């Protein structure tokens, strides 16, 4: 653990997926934001749920869009609500449709009003109804007109009257 902070970003960048996957939670916690940014995006798919939950909000917020896309959709439910609410709008926009479909209702509820407009329209359209009904009225108020237009009939029908009214539907 004491040797990890001494690794340069060039050293981190050449770690294999297997090496990244066996980093302990303590070792992951000691990585600087710059070191996390140096992890190859393809290596992130080897992180366990516990390892993902160990990452600080600062470490996650420092990740590139290719790193965000490097997570498997099956890993998405491991992110805590706090981690989700601290992602940048660029990172929110980087999630693939498949990744977005893996978000839990608690994670959807964790989006801030400044993050919601960054959710790509195609991701909104492909979210399940259990996900979309998890949006609060404050979050729905932050929807762009394009996001509202992308909602499917099933999604709209699943909303409460209050949610539909918030969207002007």
Which residues fall in each region the model found?
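General marker for long, soluble alpha-helical cores
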Residues: 1-169
């Amino acid at each position: 653990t004491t040797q990890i902070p001494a690794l340069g970003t060039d050293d981190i960048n050449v770690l294999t997926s297997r090496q990244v996957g066996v980093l302990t939670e303590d070792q992951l916690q000691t990585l600087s934001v710059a070191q996390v940014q140096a992890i190859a995006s393809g290596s992130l798919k080897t992180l366990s749920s516990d390892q993902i939950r160990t990452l600080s909000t600062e470490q996650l917020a420092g990740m590139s869009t290719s790193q965000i896309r490097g997570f498997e959709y099956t890993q998405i439910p491991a992110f805590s609500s706090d981690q989700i609410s601290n992602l940048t709008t660029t990172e929110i926009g980087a999630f693939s449709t498949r990744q977005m479909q893996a978000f839990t209702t608690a994670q959807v509820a964790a989006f801030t009003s400044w993050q919601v407009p960054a959710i790509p329209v195609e991701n909104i359209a492909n979210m399940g109804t259990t996900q979309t009904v998890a949006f609060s009225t404050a979050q729905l108020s932050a929807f762009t007109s394009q996001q509202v237009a992308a909602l499917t009939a099933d999604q709209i029908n699943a909303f409460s009257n209050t949610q539909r009214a918030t969207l002007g539907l």
